[in-house]
Amino acid sequence: MSHKLVLVLNCGSSSLKFAVIDALTGDDQISGLAECFGLEDSRIKWKVNGQKSEASLGAFTAHREAVEYIVNDILGAHPEIAAEIQAIGHRVVHGGEKFTRSVIIDESVIHGIEDCATLAPLHNPAHLIGIRAAQASFPALPQVAVFDTAFHQTMPEKAYIYALPYKLYRENAIRRYGMHGTSHLFISREAAAALGKDEADTNIICAHLGNGASVTAIKGGKSVDTSMGLTPLEGLVMGTRCGDLDPSVIFHLVNRLGYTLDEVESVLNKQSGLLGISELTNDCRGIEEGFGSGHKGATLALEIFCYRLAKYIASYTVPLERLDAVVFTGGIGENSDLIREKVLNSLAIFNFNVDKERNAAARFGNGGQITTDEGTVAMVIPTNEEWVIAQDAIELIK
């Protein structure tokens, strides 16, 4: 069988996820993570055909050294895989309004990603470092950028414009952009197939739930509304992010309580959400354990998380007009039968009837319908953003 292999790179501020994916099947040939960049113990872990390995990258190394290690040591040890790589696919968090679809990277694309860096200051600069490193290591291979924001560029103006002076949008592009677009796109395609429908005739609400979380209304395969905004801070309760908030809270923290703006930003992004409410952990597994043992903070955090999510799902029936299914994905969405059941029970008005056996079975990579055959469909579909990136890369280089 012929392969169409793509090296997928996902560069964070202090880490780099990588995988060699077969765009035809979605199978990983190689997958791994380099982390702790800039520290004394930078390391890289990887897996080839199920066999795990680990190595030190050396002190204070970063993206370039990680890419070089991937090329020289990992791929160098597997020339049969390296020889079949046809493109490099890069995940890019923010493409602003400039990038409405995946693109082959050239200098103009790099400048465009740089221009969007103020909208994703932790992510876009890291992506650019990864792109430059990959260009140096793979000068003969085409490089493709796949944007988290691109899928949401089909939202109508009434969904993405904030009720601020319009010139802030016109002159500064302040608007809702949304994130997790690659995941929501994958789920849109997979949900239509699972329902036996054409994607253009499928309306779903997708809940991507992880440490970062977002909900998207998808009508006929296109995003029509999403919960994250200008940045990933808006919307749902998340691991450490507050989600929706009265903006005057910021003024109160600064003017009355003496916080600096940097401190406020840290509170809203890194100290809030499940962690802030529970005063215990940002990890949903720990929250569920606390809920089970009667921990007051964990119980409150879980209740608020589920309540906010249920409200968003209910509100996103408005732009859809008809709902074919609610789909849960992401680390929490794929594994927490407790949260799924609590959320769907709150949406009984929409005729969701949770099948406890199906719901309990949909964990650890197992998906499928979690409601009874009577009533509205809810299902679990494990996401695969890397596969979408690989598919887009191969499609663009045809």
Swiss-Prot record:
- GO MF, one annotated term: ATP binding
- Is Endoplasmic reticulum given among the entry's keywords? no
Which superkingdom, per the lineage? Answer: Bacteria
Active site positions, chain numbering? D148
Note accompanying the cofactor annotation: Mg(2+). Can also accept Mn(2+).
Site (Transition state stabilizer) location in chain: H180, R241
Pathway of action: Metabolic intermediate biosynthesis; acetyl-CoA biosynthesis; acetyl-CoA from acetate: step 1/2
Q: Where in the cell is it found?
A: Cytoplasm
Q: Which Gene Ontology cellular component terms are annotated?
A: cytosol
HAMAP family, alphabetically?
Acetate_kinase
What is the recorded function of this protein according to its Swiss-Prot or TrEMBL entry? Answer: Catalyzes the formation of acetyl phosphate from acetate and ATP. Can also catalyze the reverse reaction.
* Assembly and oligomerization: Homodimer.
Q: Which family does it belong to?
A: Belongs to the acetokinase family.
Q: What is this protein called?
A: Acetate kinase
Identify the species of origin: Shewanella pealeana (strain ATCC 700345 / ANG-SQ1)
* Gene that produces this protein: ackA
